[in-house]
Amino acid sequence: MLVTINVAMLLLLAVFLYMLKRKNVKFSVRVMIALVLGILLGIGLQWTYGVGSQEITSTMPWYNIIGNGYIKLLQMIAMPLIFISILMAFTKMTIGKKFGRIAFFILAMLIGTTAISAIVGIGTTTLFDLEADQIMQGEAELARGEALVERAETMQDVTLPQQIVELFPANPFYDLTGARATSTIAVVMFSVFLGFAYLQVSKREREIAVTIKKGIDAIYALVMGVVRIVLRLTPYGILAIMARTVATSDFGAIYSLGKFVIASYVALIVVFIIHLIILALTGLNPIVYVKKATETLIFAFTSRTSAGTLPLNIQTQTERLGVPEGIANMSGSLGLSIGQNGCAGVYPAMLAVMIAPTVGINPLTPSFLIAVIFIVAISSFGVASVGGGATFAAILVLSALDLPIALAGILISVEPLIDMGRTALNVSGSMTAGVTTARLTGELDTQIYNTPAADKPLVES
């Protein structure tokens, strides 16, 4: 009976959100309302039944139909969107003629900002005096640590040359399912090969190239149609996800890890400010960027998926920031698997500095710091973009530094809370790379960038 009431409350709130849609309330406003309602519902459930209660445990599978169902739909569109977005980038003549230069700037920005993120993570951890042995480990943390060790053991069986080979797409259709940890970068590589093939065809067989371009444009339009349908479900997905996250969170554990949570968000905010400084150094107004990117960053924050944010990422760059479609498609897509500032930069660097003292290593020695920064930057290749990316990056970094991986499990109770900020920073990093690259290559439409954002929403109701 109580479970039925809990589910009914969620459905009533979903109906309320639908009514707001019927009244033409802006998409971004409905997402924020869903976020607040989800938090309040989660707090209400936990206050009524208590953390870990049977009522909450029995209710969550029903909430997951909406929450996890929404995440599954985001995963469904991620790979096709990455594939067609990069392929479409090559049909734009501007990027076709300047591909090498554009790719260099995008990769340099993504990897460079990841290295900077690692430095910020190291500095913040030192400033807050964080150490892994200061944190109490319960059953959940120990179980998480054991799971990470098991996963690391399977990864350690593969040599470095084999890991590099794994980046290549032996079966692109298999990688389009996202079945491997490196599937995203494999799809990117396959798309790039097809893109170069298109450029060759366009030089020799113009009529065939025109037909191919029309086909790519048609598929892109079809995929984007599916994307828009899925994105319209965002308020309902966010409502269920936030209700579940808050209802199942152990606030006692979060309070005990409050120092780490605060340190993490300080680091994430500092890196975001660095993004703004980079834009300012190229002669752009960073305040304009903040105003125009906020809606997309809020979506990334609440959904916790960089891949699911890709369509909004690209649309924000092209329609609001003046980035050509080719550069926006490439920076957004590459940013899903390379140089994620939050998940592959700040987080593993903080963990490495926290864990090092437990095995007698001074984390402030120059040799250790240089090793952390270098390994973090290199290991940012191939990080997953729909959940689990930070864990994958942490295992790679800790393994390379020969640090105990099990201690990474101590943060499981605050993982969802921190992951929200990390995801938003990942998306900001890829957008900054796109805008900066367009600026440096002379492709940025500064008139669009400096024009106040129109009332047209990113996601149509």
Say what each PLM segment does.
Residues 1-9, 13, 18-22, 28, ...:
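Signature of multi-pass transmembrane helix bundles
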Residues 40-48, 112-140, 263-300, 305-309, ...:
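Transmembrane alpha-helices that form the ion-translocation and gating core
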Residues 61-72, 101-105, 166, 174, ...:
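Short amphipathic alpha-helical coupling elements at transmembrane boundaries
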Residues 78-82, 234-237, 305-313, 343-350, ...:
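Transmembrane helix boundary and interhelical junction motifs in multipass membrane proteins
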Residues 83, 188-191, 292, 327-335, ...:
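Alpha-helical transmembrane segments of multi-pass membrane proteins
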Residues 180-186, 266, 281-289, 321-328, ...:
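Membrane-interfacial loop-to-helix junctions in multi-pass transporters
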Residues 299-378, 446-455:
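Helix-loop-helix junctions within the multi-pass membrane cores of secondary transporters/permeases
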Residues 425-461:
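Cytosolic juxtamembrane C-terminal amphipathic helix followed by a basic/polar low-complexity tail immediately after
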